[in-house]
């Protein structure tokens, strides 16, 4: 590793891809607000307790096995330990100011030990081994929750998250849309690549602007006439065969994008024309913009 000279006055320190194997020598940083140690060879979180001014810590893509030694960084607002080898969520109890937490692509099997993070606005736990949505009922300020590419079988334990505007649970093992009745502020819902068979359970989600239920097992577009704020509707790779189903979207006057490819509907030689006639506000059908 080359010798790194640090400016004690620096507020933003970026040591991305420096082949750093050990966190050391950073106590000289008296004013540091953001410390980026992405893509290094760090195995252990250590020697950071002096950095009381730190607001953002980025440890993305290292070899870290455990969240530890962060107790002193009580002012931390953004923490990214994605693409490491973490097995547990732990060691965060003192980080009560944390607003964004990224733990993507680790080996985490359980959501736990987050109850003190009541300022948290964004939680990203995609690409882990999580089987259940649990232990998040104290996170009432949460705005965005990302749980894609896990092993979740049921939509549950979301009732307390009334401020949630973005929920992403793509590529899991869901079979039913449920448990969303309290999420009245939800604007974006991503449920693609699951085993969902029926569109249901969205009665209270009137503010939805984006609904992605692509790559499921849905035979009918139904129960969404009340979603009049909808701007994007992703329904490709399902089993839709009846053109009259598009009537469900007629009230969505702001609808601009629909994905319906790889449904039985697409076999119709008038496929694009029929969508344009049924949904005149649409500007994009599948990946192609509408020509006028």
Where are the regions that the model predicts?
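Intrinsically disordered, low-complexity regulatory regions enriched in Ser/Pro/Gly/Thr
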Residues: 4-8, 27-29, 49-50, 71-72, ...
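Canonical leucine-rich repeat
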Residues: 23-26, 45-48, 67-70, 89-92, ...
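Leucine-rich repeat domain C-terminal region
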Residues: 209-215, 219-292
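Conserved hydrophobic beta-strand positions in leucine-rich repeat
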Residues: 11-15, 32-37, 54-59, 76-81, ...
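A generic tandem-repeat structural signature
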Residues: 38, 43-132, 137-139, 148
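LRR N-terminal entry segment and analogous cap-like coil->beta motifs
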Residues: 2-46, 51-56
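Eukaryotic tandem repeat interaction scaffolds
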Residues: 131-231
